[in-house]
């Protein structure tokens, strides 16, 4: 994905506030040299941030007529308004090793025996994983095939088919669960409400006791 950045001349809290009022977003690019202070068009950045690829893939930043490869590292949003306050990028090249969280794309869920045969549901325990690799080989996402998952089974990190150069960063966790089949609770049948027995109507032609005594 591509985006355009411009030099940010003014600095400080007041300058950043005026920049935001004018529809711009202050940002910084660090790594492989001196930090580069930039500004971006707010609306263009806001819409780009809605795309998954903008968060988890190499980006081509056009700056002063030249292209640089960067990764999105941090976004600061306003507490209650749909406004981007600040953005950080990391400058990288093909030889830079990076760690980055990438989303998981789950496929074949409807074909899993635990779903198709046993009417279970698949719980997605995690939806993204942190990976380490060369910047040039960073995957936009990881595909998780759930097609063989049966009742009572779980899919773990070690079960994933990763690109050869990509390694999952576990940070002390041992083979965590990615997804698991859970069974739906059986619905209890509603209790039958006893219907009161209607009193039998008195037979025709019979007189009451009082009438017989007369």
From Swiss-Prot:
InterPro entries: Rbsml_bL25/Gln-tRNA_synth_N, Ribosomal_bL25/Gln-tRNA_synth, Ribosomal_bL25_b-dom, Ribosomal_bL25_C, Ribosomal_bL25_long, Ribosomal_L25_dom, Ribosomal_uL5_bac-type. Residues 188-214 are annotated as: Disordered. GO terms for cellular component: cytosolic large ribosomal subunit. Keywords: Ribonucleoprotein, Ribosomal protein, RNA-binding, rRNA-binding. One of its GO terms (biological process) is translation. HAMAP family: Ribosomal_bL25_CTC. Part of the 50S ribosomal subunit; part of the 5S rRNA/L5/L18/L25 subcomplex. Contacts the 5S rRNA. Binds to the 5S rRNA independently of L5 and L18. This is Large ribosomal subunit protein bL25. It comes from Methylibium petroleiphilum (strain ATCC BAA-1232 / LMG 22953 / PM1).
């Amino acid at each position: 994905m591509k985006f355009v950045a411009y030099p940010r001349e003014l600095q400080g809290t007041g300058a950043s506030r005026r920049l935001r009022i004018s529809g711009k977003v202050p940002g910084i690019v660090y790594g492989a040299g001196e930090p580069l202070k930039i500004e971006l068009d707010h609306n263009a950045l806001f819409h780009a941030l809605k795309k998954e690829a903008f968060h988890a893939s190499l980006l081509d930043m056009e700056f002063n007529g030249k292209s640089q490869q960067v990764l999105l590292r941090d976004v600061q949003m306003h507490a209650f308004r749909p406004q981007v306050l600040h953005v950080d990028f990391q400058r990288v090249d093909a030889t830079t090793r990076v760690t980055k969280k990438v989303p998981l794309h789950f496929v074949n869920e409807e074909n899993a025996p635990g779903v198709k045969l046993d009417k279970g549901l698949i719980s997605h325990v995690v939806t993204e994983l942190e990976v380490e690799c060369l910047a040039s080989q960073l995957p936009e996402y990881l595909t998780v095939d759930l097609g063989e998952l049966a009742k009572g089974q779980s899919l773990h990190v070690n079960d994933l088919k990763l690109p050869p150069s990509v390694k999952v960063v576990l940070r002390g966790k041992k083979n965590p669960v990615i997804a698991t089949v859970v069974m739906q609770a059986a619905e209890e049948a509603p209790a039958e409400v006893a219907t009161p027995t209607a009193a039998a109507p008195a037979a025709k032609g019979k007189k009451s006791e009082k009438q017989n005594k007369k």
